[in-house]
Amino acid sequence: MTRLPDPVPATDALPQAGRRTFLTRAGTGAGALAAGALLAGNATAQPQRDHAPASAGAPGAGPFWPDGIRLVISISMQFEAGGQPPKGTDSPFPKIDFPASMPSDPATNTWFAYGYREGIPRMLDLWDRHGVKVTSHMIGEAVQRHPELAREIVARGHEAAGHGPRWSSQYAMTRAQERAFLSESVTMVEAVTGQRPVGYNCNWLRRGPNTLSLLQELGYLYHIDDLSRDEPFIEQVNGRDFVVVPYTLRNNDILLVEGRNYSPSAFLEQIKLDFDQLYEEAGTRRRMMSISAHDRISGTPQMVRAWDAFLRYAKQHPGVAFLRKDEIARYTAASPLSVREQETI
């Protein structure tokens, strides 16, 4: 795994301050250098540039990323196929209340099966072509049902992160139930991949009042269930630091579940617009762009073409790096320049 250099000194830093309707409302609207090459020394990244003074109120003003990196891009590849409930989950098909005599929804399950049969293998080849490393949020049951695929993800240099042992709403659990749930998630992923997860993503980002403290107790370094910033930051959980590497709804392929009023072309245009704005802001502010790819959605032929076009586009810009979320979290935890939120939501 490529590692970021030690955090830059703080001498020049500014003083630090002490699925469907839901996503349709939140997300509709509307290339990059690989971190491995960029940070290993054989990249085309430009030397560190002088940063223009940031306004006093600008979040995270001042230089942040090392080695001439201007903008970090963080990709989530959700490995959920095989971990979904047998019936009743979101899909392109109309909702049906199946009778008890119908134990599963075959049509929806074939849609999910595309994720592990075609989607992830196709995306892995795409990341390889561009030298991009991603973070794969893995449902434990999906990993157990398709262990070879989970191991292949890690073998190609990607991060295995937690996404629950199964598709469940953990916010409704007692503390003891949720602790067992989270522990099981760690065990299932580590047993198959050999990599112990240090990052976590709740189902639909819906965490409960005990989730963060439990993650911290279990040795997690970061979570992503937060949409409040375009950069990583630190919040306090039980008086101790816990890193947030924010997720995204706007740059999220889940909007394509229904296939109406949205398309791969719209997705491409949206992430390019997002990139352009964040790249511009990154001249004076620390910036991170998040993008989400689900196995059965972004792994389709037309979506891989859209992703490929975006990667080629971003490669035209100097100082852009794709980093795994564990890399981002470790750098954020160690850097004196990291934003420290006084509010923990």
Locate predicted features:
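Active-site-adjacent pocket scaffolds in enzyme catalytic domains
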Residues: 51-67, 187-284, 339-341
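Metal-dependent polysaccharide deacetylase catalytic core of the NodB/CE4 family, i.e.
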Residues: 100-104, 121-124, 128-209, 232, ...
